[in-house]
């Protein structure tokens, strides 16, 4: 029997807690002993599919040639096994072989493993761009096509979603309106039960159409009663660099449409975020915008060379980097100093020696190779200050969303490019205020806290050794039995395998016990939903003779996930339709632990007073760490109490955030930017670079790269209004100083609103003028608070924005929970908690 325990009893056996007597409060970037990971996790693999089964992950697709990579932790993929060979009647005699296997989809259903993928062969002999379907009784194959005389469906990027009622849906991409996402219902045997239904195509005039009309790579999950589809938009090629991941929400599996799309990409190239926060010194080195003075560089001996001149008011004292995006062989010199750009196409940030720069006029010489094949796509110069630059990472795509090893976390497995090399990456998915948020794109040098996937506290092939010491936990079982009546027993509740499910084959059980509420899925079918259970102990037992069951995999992890009316175990607090109503006091839930995550959504209903939040770490009333929101002052208050003495740190909630027009309220005549909750807004920022000439929106050559695309005064071109209830009111603004000269900033008296509207002031002005802008806000009424404790370090976040790290002097077990002073009417919409291993 393979059994693994880790820290399972740690919070139980330590009855006497060490006080946090010599703990220290640190709100700077603190080092953490938590295990991290380095992207990419698999080099050289592009469009792929990923499946979790019985505690292992299987990944295959482009450049795996019919193989699966295998991992137990999403990070290490050393095992590789061959599972499939492309050999059928409809590809015979063509060049469509194993190298044409694209965009795998793998899943387990009723004793069979299913492999779907798209052949993507555009040969001179034949075009073979179809989806096929193969099966195997073993996860490691060999897989055989169900029919070898014809393909399964058209055209690319298959994904099969099983709803919690057991119904199956195939999502795919057809070449109808550009690349368009469609969905089609299926029977349990993977035959079709209805016609395909168009979901959506890419939306003109948005981030989805920076180049081509492409919507592809759909992946669907259901979480907390909502359906989420992640997808790709724009051309996949790194020569464009525009590929991004978006999300669409729906209330039904075939109900995805333009109105459900997030207005923004959830994962994009980090080149964009650099320009959002750093001014390009080639244009703004003098403190204000200046055009690049260019001329022909024939005197260099290369007629295709260009000379660019830029002005610096002073030589930057920080870390300076030159961004160079080029397609092979570009040569660059700064004031005569050569940049070793290499001969290959690449996205790079090159560190620049301060001695190479000078106050006043500086010169860039850019030469193409003499054969004239090199192309410059983008060039910029940045002052990063004390920051170190990350690698330039672009074209995130082909998403797969899987549960992490501990069963609580969600992880995104996807491809991305570092330069021109495409590989597999992983990043954590969070749900913040109901929205899907991705902690990425990340590389080895990405700033911030990016812990590795958490492992289960117990993993093995038996449940007999699990103590079930907590009243809240997740148990995952992959097991089979020949018994006609088979299932599990918890307290007074028996959950049976439905008659419609086959016997004597493995089934995947997901059992969530949240105090006295029980939820069970079998093969992703919801068979028990938040039913009350009375227990004398918390153990899960197998129905009948346990010797008649074969357990392939069991994983146990303490924690709970609750939302809406499904709260339990909070003592005197009660839940309504929309969540848990906070009263005055403090409430703790779960055993003490040394490593955990707590994520809480709060809605203060436009409170004008009161503090509320989370108890991040609690030993006793004289030793704790709390993170609270002060509604009246729009602040985050962090209290660290040691032996009754409290050290308080206060940070403003105010932020400036990039927003995109909401397509539901936007057309060619006006743009509306909407907020999910009431937001207190007091500033707007507009990029001086025109959205019609975004350098990331086109396949640029050197001439286009240096062309002037500057708008001196964006704000005055717009009539701006804010939404007051259901009434639009004009916004009275004034010009303000911007910390980034690449952005124009205007301010106004704070307004509480859910929307802003922009209309071109001149009726004859048909330009876009604005698209991506920044909104400055004091606070919002709905917030997601998250704490991640890893040993001594407690990382704190509000709306996925870091508010620092508290570092304890001793790694002692603590509890966590909710708190409020009772002055604000606060509703807790969801809580996710789990012990981290």
Model-derived segments and spans:
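Edge beta-strands of jelly-roll/beta-sandwich modules across compartments, strongly enriched
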Residues: 371-381, 549-554, 764-777, 826-831
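Hydrophobic core segments of beta-strands in well-ordered, beta-rich domains
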Residues: 46-65, 102-123, 145-148, 157-184, ...
